[in-house]
């Protein structure tokens, strides 16, 4: 079984009446994969080895909105390790930053 990773550029959909986030709209996404991703996913707390997994840290198949620091870490990781579709991922991150949008990651293994 392989590791499939999606890097998503998105923005929150906010309720005009109460101001709460209703949903996140996906503006663009880039798919990648491979074992090269495991160390990065573990470093941001997305991937947790099975024996250490709890309900709170089980992100399998779920979207994780990255912080600015995690987004910086993602950009540096992609630039250094050159995973599948690295140029597209770096472009997605740059555009998300220019547009003030979120970078979201989702992985299945």
What is each PLM-predicted segment?
Residues 1-109:
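Acidic (Asp/Glu-rich) sequence patches and key acidic residues
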């Amino acid at each position: 079984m392989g590791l499939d990773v999606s890097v998503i550029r998105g923005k929150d959909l906010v309720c005009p009446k109460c101001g709460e986030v209703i949903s996140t709209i996906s503006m663009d996404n880039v798919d990648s994969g491979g074992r090269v991703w495991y160390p990065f996913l573990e470093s941001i707390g997305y991937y947790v080895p099975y024996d250490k997994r709890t309900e709170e840290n089980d992100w399998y198949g779920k979207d994780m909105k990255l912080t600015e620091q995690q987004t910086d870490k993602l950009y540096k990781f992609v630039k250094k390790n050159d995973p599948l579709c690295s140029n597209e991922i770096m472009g997605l991150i740059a555009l998300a930053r220019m547009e003030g949008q979120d970078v979201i990651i989702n992985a299945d293994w």
